[in-house]
Amino acid sequence: VLVLLARAVATGSVLAALTDPAVVDALALSTLTTSICVVLVLVLGIPLALLLARSHFRGSALLETIVDLPIVLPPSVAGIALLLVLGRRGLLGDPLAALGLTLPFTTAAVVLAQFFVAAPFFIRSARAGLAGVEREIEDAARVDGATERQVFRYVTAPLAAPALAAGLVTAWARALGEFGATIIFAGSIEGRTQTLPLVVYGEFQSSNLDASIAASAVLVIAALIALLLVRGLHWSRALDARGAG
């Protein structure tokens, strides 16, 4: 990784990449799709994480396994799974077609592929953070007249915030680097489905090594920033725990 960054900086290829139309389009598309993905992860992930953290019911272990499954699945298998369910000839292909919706090889397919592989990382972190919130504190808020929504907004969420934020950053980084599921389910159409990882692959296939290295360097820099943010959040949690102790 350090060699890649050093070469990219030494040759000035990173700056050149930022003016390359294909890289610029891919960067813009990646920014758009990962932003939408993060919103979906938050909206759908928090209720599921809360359910897994607070409720013990028959089948909860199975549900946890299903949620975690995309983490261990090869990305290409995830892409095939999405095609089998949401493709034109997939399980939901006909109902979607009846609604006039076609998902494969669209920008929406990119978002779905990113969400499929990234959401479990957020849910795992959020589940751990929410499970660590002391029920007594929440009960005290309820005694004072707080509604369940107010308890979550003003008590639970702030206490679990470091874990939620760390999970969200990790999910965003995973979505940004997603390749296998995207290329199978969404393809690599410039301006529509070609994200940065697909540019790296495409330029390498075209024997344009400098452009491939430059696009890779952009991804590495983004990954390093995400890693530093996660480490900072974990450090903040450790300090808070020591202070509380």
What name fits each language-model region?
Residues 1-12, 21-131, 155-180, 203, ...:
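Membrane-water interface segments at the C-terminal ends of transmembrane alpha-helices
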Residues 133-137, 243:
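Short glycine/proline-centered loop/turn elements that form peptide/ligand docking sites
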Residues 144-146, 158:
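Glycine/proline-centered hinge or cleavage motifs at structural transition points of membrane proteins
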Residues 84, 181-207:
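Glycine-rich helix-loop "coupling/hinge" segments at transmembrane-helix boundaries
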Residues 152:
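Active-site/ligand-binding-proximal alpha/beta "capping" segment
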Residues 58, 146-148:
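Short coil/turn motifs that cap or connect alpha-helices
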Residues 141:
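The alpha-helix within a helix-turn-helix
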